[in-house]
A protein has these predicted regions:
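Conserved "HGTGT" condensation-loop signature of ketosynthase/thiolase-family condensing enzymes
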Residues: 1-116, 146-201
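Active-site-proximal alpha-helical scaffold in enzymes
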Residues: 41-46, 51-53, 116-142
Length: 201
């Protein structure tokens, strides 16, 4: 049953070093420019799509995060505090909220809709609601990726995220006989674990 595949989520949380998924699928230029948070989100999303057997370039996507790339935000703040502020173009283009969506469309060649949402401590629920709303209206599947990394100080004091991680899910509206129950398959990155978090019968 699908709920048996969610059993790892019921285990007590254990801190572990965050392992970023391999980013071989990224073109060299994007691999150099993408920060840790973006590589984490893309890697987890790419794993979920590969596990689902879907074509990454043909599905809508929703990315959800508390702060997207906190390290990049921190570096920009430090640069702006200098006597003569200088800001690299890479830092600037990675600072926009939907940077990860942009990287995703570059990597996959997707012309499908892509959305980036932010929502503080409620981000998982907000991302899931957005993905389910899109799945209910769309003719095809939707990818949801929820991700966060640990913020550096002083941002950590404002919003302490104890550990980074990501979870991704692909799903679509169920058939009428399933009463609209969503079907999906997913992948999680929590420390050095990769686990299947599918919600399928």
């Amino acid at each position: 049953a699908w709920w048996d595949r969610l059993s790892p989520l019921a285990q007590p949380w254990q801190p572990a070093p965050l392992v970023i998924p391999a980013s071989d699928f990224l073109p060299p230029a994007e691999r150099r420019r993408a920060g840790q948070a973006i590589r984490l989100a893309l890697g987890c999303g790419y794993q979920a799509v590969a596990d689902s057997g879907l074509e990454a370039g043909g599905i809508a996507s929703v990315f959800a995060s508390t702060d997207v790339d906190a390290e990049n935000t921190h570096r920009i703040c430090l640069a702006l505090n200098e006597a003569e502020p200088t800001l690299s173009p890479t830092r600037f283009h990675n600072s926009v909220q939907n940077a990860v969506s942009g990287y995703w469309t570059i990597v996959t060649g997707s012309h499908a809709p892509t959305t980036m949402v932010m929502g503080g401590d409620d981000i998982f629920a907000i991302g899931l609601l957005e993905a389910m709303a899109q799945a209910a209206q769309a003719a095809g599947p939707v990818l949801l990726v929820v991700f966060d990394v640990v913020m550096p100080e002083p941002l950590f004091s404002v919003h302490p995220i104890e550990g980074g991680g990501a979870v991704a899910w692909t799903g679509s509206r169920g058939a009428p006989e399933d009463h609209g129950r969503p079907e999906g398959v997913g992948a999680g990155v929590d420390g050095c674990e990769h686990r299947d978090a599918a919600a399928r019968d």
